[in-house]
């Protein structure tokens, strides 16, 4: 058990290991990835977003990025290329996708999507296709 507030958690299982990703709002590094072998005892394995390099306000140099950082992320594992995918929206403006071959990292930014996919879910289908489902009043895939 970790004494921490991990909001918007997404849990996946890869083999016999469980991984969870969470929102971190304004903290850097962001999007912690937790690891558990029993769903009770958890440890921090890494961070999907190594640094919040999304603008000066995240450096706390006179601007304020509080509660404008990482929200509502999703984590997936793609067995075909042995890669973890992290998807999350930042600053209510864009969606970012990061990848790594191990949850400990290194994680790197794969792409940026110009729309904020809030509360999105990332799915690797049985045919190896990647899907993102998101929405509020309406759902999109």
Located regions from the model:
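Carbohydrate-active catalytic/glycan-binding domains of CAZyme proteins
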Residues: 1-141
């Amino acid at each position: 058990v970790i004494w921490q507030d991990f909001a918007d958690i997404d849990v996946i299982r890869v083999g016999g290991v469980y991984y969870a990703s969470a929102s971190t709002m304004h903290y850097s590094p962001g999007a912690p990835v937790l690891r558990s072998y029993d769903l009770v005892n958890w440890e921090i394995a890494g961070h999907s977003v190594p640094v919040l390099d999304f603008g000066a306000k995240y450096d706390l140099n006179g601007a304020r990025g509080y509660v404008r950082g990482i929200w509502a992320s999703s984590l997936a594992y793609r067995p075909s290329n042995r890669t973890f995918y992290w998807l999350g929206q930042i600053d209510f403006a864009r969606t970012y996708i990061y990848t790594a071959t191990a949850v400990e990292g290194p994680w790197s930014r794969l792409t940026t999507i110009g729309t904020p996919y809030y509360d999105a879910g990332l799915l690797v289908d049985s045919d190896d296709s990647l899907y993102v489902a998101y929405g509020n009043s309406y759902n999109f895939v």
